[in-house]
Curated annotation (Swiss-Prot):
Cellular compartment(s): Cytoplasm
Catalytic activity line of the entry: cytidine(1402) in 16S rRNA + S-adenosyl-L-methionine = N(4)-methylcytidine(1402) in 16S rRNA + S-adenosyl-L-homocysteine + H(+)
Residues the record lists as binding S-adenosyl-L-methionine: G38, G39, H40, D58, Y85, D106, Q113
Record carries keyword Transferase: yes
EC number(s) on file: 2.1.1.199
SUPFAM superfamilies the UniProt entry points to: Putative methyltransferase TM0872, insert domain, S-adenosyl-L-methionine-dependent methyltransferases
Cellular component, GO, one term: cytoplasm
Species in which this protein is naturally found: Lachnoclostridium phytofermentans (strain ATCC 700394 / DSM 18823 / ISDg) (Clostridium phytofermentans)
Name of this protein: Ribosomal RNA small subunit methyltransferase H 2
Pfam family, one: Methyltransf_5
GN (gene name): rsmH2
Major localization listed first in the record, in broad terms: cytoplasm
GO molecular-function terms, A-Z: rRNA (cytosine-N4-)-methyltransferase activity
């Protein structure tokens, strides 16, 4: 299947909810930090006037190519940049943009990445262990699995996969690689399966899911990038501008929720102080105290939306 066909079949999660959450101004400037195939971008662009601008950022070469084709009818308004969204501030500075009306992040791995076996993201298809979102980087999942210490692998699976069998999985990975390096997704999956009791494997989801997630997060620095970039993104918003973020697991959601709460209520004074003396000012409002979840209808036609959560922050100074 070609890249175009795969991207055509990709379904953007929480599409209408995300578009609504951005409160789009027709003449506004919007930034997509995880452009992907351009599904969300297309819907935003349809709502912009000829004066509106859209900047799409993605580190994945295939995503850049697919989005460029999908958004070609808006070429006068769209700027696509191959980069990580952690560089958003610099990307906008290079374009002469100081503030924007809205920012969107759709985190995690894309359907295209999962459905392209040779990318090595999926435990359902045998392929070389890769998992790089940006193939310009030299480090791959194979390097992590074969070169990290047992303690490091345990830490990754425990912290980023939240798997209670993390210690045993790390032990089995190291044991199997001592016989021969683990080269493929199937070989890694076999090591994981061997570490988890059959009774547990029969009654839960795929045993490799959490470990694959953990290795991918470690390799691509996903949580580190998110944590270190949230403040910059809020600062880039104009008054009334909105930051909308779709997360797919609790680790991401906790980081976003904490950052939004902190920027809504930044005061660190003890509760018994009569007045604030820390002088930390709120930057806006976390307008989704409870995250927006996929509808029953969306869950039916897009199973991958099951764990998605949308949170929105509105800038006020």
């Amino acid at each position: 299947m070609s890249l175009e066909e795969k991207e055509f079949k990709h379904i953007s999660v929480l599409l209408q909810e995300t578009i609504d959450s951005l409160n789009i101004k027709p003449d506004g400037i919007y930034v997509d930090g995880t452009l992907g195939g351009g599904g969300h971008a297309y819907e935003v662009l349809k709502r912009l006037s000829p004066k509106g601008r859209y900047i799409g950022i993605d580190q994945d070469e295939d995503a850049i190519a697919a989005a460029g084709k999908r958004l070609s009818e808006f070429s006068d308004q769209v700027t696509i940049v191959r980069s990580n969204y952690c560089n958003m501030k610099q990307v906008l500075k290079d374009l002469g943009i100081d503030k924007v009306d809205g920012i969107l992040l759709d985190l995690g791995v894309s359907s295209y990445q999962l459905d392209t076996p040779e990318r090595g993201f999926s435990y359902r298809e045998n392929a070389p262990l890769d998992m790089r979102m940006d193939n310009r980087n030299s480090l791959t999942a194979r390097d992590i699995v074969n070169e990290y210490s047992e303690q490091e692998i345990y830490r990754i699976i425990r912290d980023y996969g939240e798997d209670k069998f993390a210690k045993n999985i790390a032990k089995h990975i190291v044991r199997m690689r001592s016989e021969k390096p683990l080269e493929t997704t199937d070989e890694l999956t076999e090591a994981i399966k061997a570490a988890i009791p059959m009774k547990i494997r029969m009654n839960t989801g795929h045993p490799a899911k959490k470990t694959f997630q953990a290795i991918r997060i470690e390799l691509n620095h996903e949580l580190e990038v998110l944590t270190n970039t949230l403040e910059d993104m809020i600062d880039l918003l104009k008054e009334d501008g909105r930051l909308s973020i779709i997360t797919f697991h609790s680790l991401e959601d906790r980081i976003v929720k904490a950052a939004f709460r902190k920027n809504e209520n930044p005061c660190v004074c003890p509760p018994n102080f009569p007045v604030c003396v820390c002088n930390r000012k709120p930057k806006g409002i976390h307008i989704t105290k409870k995250p927006i979840l996929p509808s029953e209808q969306e869950l039916e036609y897009n199973k991958r939306s099951k764990s998605a959560k949308l949170r929105v922050f509105e800038k006020h100074e």
